[in-house]
A protein has these predicted regions:
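N-terminal amphipathic/basic-hydrophobic helices that include classical n-h-c signal peptides
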Residues: 1-25
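Short boundary motifs at domain starts and secondary-structure transition points
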Residues: 6, 19-22, 97-102, 143, ...
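Acidic, glycine-enriched catalytic cores built around paired aspartates
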Residues: 22-76, 84-94, 104, 303-305, ...
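Structured, charged N-terminal subsegments at the starts of enzyme catalytic cores
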Residues: 73-155, 159-163, 170
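Well-ordered, non-membrane alpha-helical segments in soluble/globular domains
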Residues: 82-94, 124-138, 164-178, 216-222, ...
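Core alpha/beta catalytic barrel or barrel-like domain that forms the active/cofactor pocket
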Residues: 105-114, 142-160, 182-208, 228-247, ...
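Structural alpha-beta junctions
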Residues: 134-147, 174-180, 229, 259-273, ...
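A cross-taxonomic marker for long C-terminal extensions/tails that follow the last structured domain
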Residues: 210-213, 221-294, 309-360
Length: 508
């Protein structure tokens, strides 16, 4: 595509504005659309049930223009990385993006591989960073002024400030910095090619494991040290910690990190904007269009919430639009104080029992996981193999598939490990996590009390704590799934898994 057609016959006159992240007080998004494949129903614009690269271009436009999200996370890990997403969006949807400036009114935020963990995809990080100035040039031609459509990247599995500083420094020294290099004839790269902008990018740490969550504020503080930043975004996972440590542990770890971020903000004077990665299953966050106020009230201190594929595509569009509007308008709360040591003691006991029960089910989980349908053509990030150290060399599916497999067996993963908690523990947890009863009730609805995979101790403890209202339709479908597995007739197993997921309105 000849990029000149994007200018609308408007001459490009550079308007040099201060676009260094953290210096300009830009509008921080409240609602981040992501590419997590937890949906049952494919979106209407998809050519196939599994979304491919061009579908994701259409998706970004759809969530901006129709659903009302103010940010799209773009995953740069996997087989079909598209470093021309900005050019494609501005080319295909010119009228919309002329009225809505990408990088100011709306954000496209890239999720990059972490070379410390994902060695096989490490060089994709460099390719992605190199694409940022090209996207800047494309947008500047389109808007007729300096425009930075991408100026932040998300680093998954952040475990140290060094991981963040390496990316920040690489961009400054090798992407931006190459313009100062001199060629053999004495001409600089800048004179030959032009400027490389934006001048700087910022890195959003994504904390996904136990240690990362407990040290999130410390790591962020070290990254801020020596930088002239007025604001910083930070990202807390909710899904992978649930898979690794159980739902209650994940929620409590989020609470600790949010409380620590509040303290860091006060000490550093840098405004922090925490993002929480929420799915629709209670296990992965329980964020749906109909309970936005409950969840945002539960996660006081969080500023931005993710809406994943199930939120967007498994509900009526009018409900989704209302839910997103609420997400964007609700006033952020202040993170409360946390009794850290008491919380950590509960996490330790609960996590041990949760992992023991997962180990008992690992074979059946992996067997069912093979039949859980995919919803994206490319894989997302490699992620944490949370059981490889403490539970032997056990391989488990990713969190969405893991969740879908257990729900299909009538064993919502939210219930695992619950029997490790005393009545005193539960009273204390409810002070920190007031929505515990609600989340368990939402999950237990899809349990099958007759499932051979639901342990009697979990069932009895649960029924003492809440009064489950089992969904008869879902119970019947899980009975068919269990019967098919028992007699090894799996021809229609995927169809049954989708039927159960449709009844829940989320895949996993």
């Amino acid at each position: 595509v000849n990029i000149q057609i994007l200018v609308y016959h408007q001459p490009y006159i550079p308007v040099h504005r201060n676009i260094i992240p953290g210096v300009l007080n830009m509008k921080v998004p409240r609602c981040m659309s992501t590419q997590h494949p937890d949906n049952v129903n494919p979106p209407f614009f998809a050519e196939e049930p599994e979304l491919g690269g061009e579908d994701e271009i259409r998706e970004a436009y759809y969530v901006f223009s129709h659903l009302g999200c103010d940010e799209q996370m773009w995953d740069c890990e996997g087989k079909e990385v598209d470093n021309y997403v900005v050019k494609k969006l501005l080319t295909k949807y010119q009228a919309f993006f002329q009225d809505h400036v990408l990088g100011e009114d709306l954000r496209l935020t890239l999720r990059v591989p972490n070379p410390t963990v994902e060695r096989a995809e490490a060089k994709i990080l460099l390719e992605t960073l190199e694409s940022i100035p090209r996207s800047y040039d494309t947008a500047s031609l389109f808007y007729g002024m300096d425009a930075a459509p991408v100026f932040e990247v998300i680093l998954p599995m952040t475990s140290s400030s060094s991981c963040l500083n390496r990316i920040h420094s690489y961009y400054l020294d090798f992407v931006k910095g190459k313009e100062r290099l001199q060629l053999a004839d004495g001409v600089t790269v800048k004179e030959w090619i032009g400027e490389f902008r934006p001048d700087e990018i910022n890195v959003i740490p994504l904390f996904e494991d136990h240690e990362g969550m407990l040290n999130a504020a410390k790591i962020t503080g070290e990254y801020l040290d020596g930088k002239d930043l007025m604001e910083q975004r930070v990202f807390l996972a909710r899904s992978d910690p649930a898979m690794n440590y159980g739902m209650i542990s994940a929620t409590l770890l989020n609470r600790i990190a949010l409380s620590d971020f509040r303290d860091l903000e006060e000490e550093s004077g840098v405004k922090l904007y925490p993002i929480i990665g929420m799915g629709s299953a209670p296990f992965r966050g329980n964020l749906r269009p109909d309970n936005v106020e409950d969840v945002t009230g539960e996660y006081r201190g969080a500023y931005t919430f993710t809406v994943q594929s199930s939120f967007k595509y498994d509900h009526e569009p009018s409900e989704v639009i209302r839910g997103i509007k609420k997400l964007r308008s609700v006033k952020p709360g202040r993170a409360p104080e946390i009794e850290r040591e008491s919380v950590l003691e509960i996490i330790s006991a609960y996590c041990r029992e949760y992992r023991r029960q997962v180990m008992d089910l690992v074979d059946i989980i992996n067997r069912v996981a093979r039949y859980v349908p995919g919803r994206r053509k490319r894989k997302l990030h490699i992620g944490l193999f949370g059981y490889s150290r403490s539970m032997g060399n056990v391989s488990l599916p990713r969190a969405i598939t893991f969740t879908a497999a257990l729900y299909s067996l009538g064993v919502p993963p939210e219930l695992l490990g619950f029997n490790a908690l005393s009545s005193g523990d539960l009273e204390f947890i409810e002070e920190v996590y007031p929505g515990l009863r609600r989340d368990l009730h939402d999950a237990a609805r899809y349990a099958n009390p007759e499932s051979p995979f639901l342990s009697p101790e979990v069932k009895s403890t649960l029924e003492e704590y809440i009064e489950p209202e089992y969904d008869e339709g879902h119970m019947k479908t899980t009975e068919e799934i269990i019967r098919a597995l028992r007699i090894n007739r799996t021809a229609n197993l995927q169809e049954l898994i989708l039927e159960a997921a449709s009844q829940r309105k989320f895949l996993g």
